[in-house]
Curated annotation (Swiss-Prot):
Keywords: Cell inner membrane, Cell membrane, Lipid biosynthesis, Lipid metabolism, Membrane, Phospholipid biosynthesis, Phospholipid metabolism, Transferase, Transmembrane, Transmembrane helix. The gene is plsY. One of its GO terms (biological process) is phospholipid biosynthetic process. Catalyzes the transfer of an acyl group from acyl-phosphate (acyl-PO(4)) to glycerol-3-phosphate (G3P) to form lysophosphatidic acid (LPA). This enzyme utilizes acyl-phosphate as fatty acyl donor, but not acyl-CoA or acyl-ACP. PANTHER family: GLYCEROL-3-PHOSPHATE ACYLTRANSFERASE-RELATED, INNER MEMBRANE PROTEIN YGIH. This is Glycerol-3-phosphate acyltransferase. One of its GO terms (molecular function) is acyl-phosphate glycerol-3-phosphate acyltransferase activity. It holds the Pfam family G3P_acyltransf. It catalyses: an acyl phosphate + sn-glycerol 3-phosphate = a 1-acyl-sn-glycero-3-phosphate + phosphate.
Length: 216
């Protein structure tokens, strides 16, 4: 399989709107018109149940992992740069799905899948950042933004200090590029956070979150 065909495969696989299809199939709802109107795991879980949300999360992560892994197996001559290209194609497919009129999700879970294959330690660090921000503010969107911003930093420090290896500027540059894209896809969330109208991941967390922040 040559480079263009595999890159196209990566885009198409990334563009599969699992969240939209699962919500439509099992709840009969168009997830794009409810809640945060996002097709990702958080909106699915919030609206039709977290068992479905976690399924969507796993599938969206797999959309990022699969193209990167398969490109390393079937197009090894492409090396890390081509694996990264396939990862970017998968993320762009998720953000601009042709199945949904070239609209899509935020790309966070798919990005996690891409770099889970390439830089697992950095991904675990980003997950930790996400969890800390989420526990304090109760916003998945804010946790995702902070995790995407810190991912390149965690990668650089973990590579140098823990693995004692040289930083790949291909990997670092791709992380920065995708992180910028994720921030752009969250621009409406940022506005809602500033306006104090952002939805919490779990119903009932709003009062708990406000009370906890007031105590601090």
């Amino acid at each position: 399989m040559n480079f263009p065909i595999f890159a196209l495969f990566s885009f198409i696989s990334g563009s599969i709107p699992f969240g939209y299809w699962i919500a439509l199939r099992f709840a009969g709802v168009d997830i794009r018109k409810l809640g945060s109107k996002n097709i990702g795991a958080t909106n699915v879980g919030r609206l039709i149940g977290w068992k479905f949300g976690f399924v969507v999360l796993a599938l969206d992560i797999t959309k990022g992992m699969l193209p990167v892994y398969l490109s390393s197996v079937y197009v090894p001559e492409g090396g890390i740069p081509f694996q990264l290209l396939c990862g970017v194609c998968a993320v762009l497919g998720h953000m601009f799905s042709p199945f949904l009129g070239f609209r899509g999700g935020k790309g966070v879970a798919t990005t996690f899948g891409v770099f889970l294959v390439l830089t697992p330690i950095a991904c675990l660090g980003a997950v930790l950042v996400f969890w800390v921000v989420y526990k304090f503010f109760k916003f998945v969107s804010l946790g995702s933004i902070f995790a995407s911003i810190t991912l390149p930093l965690v990668y650089a420090f973990s590579t140098i200090l823990l693995l004692h290896e040289e930083v790949s500027y291909w990997v670092l540059g791709t992380m920065v590029f995708i992180s910028f894209g994720i921030i752009l896809t969250h621009r409406e969330n940022i506005i809602r956070i500033l306006n104090r109208s952002e939805l919490f991941a779990v119903k009932g967390e709003e009062q708990d979150g406000d009370s906890e922040r007031n105590r601090r």
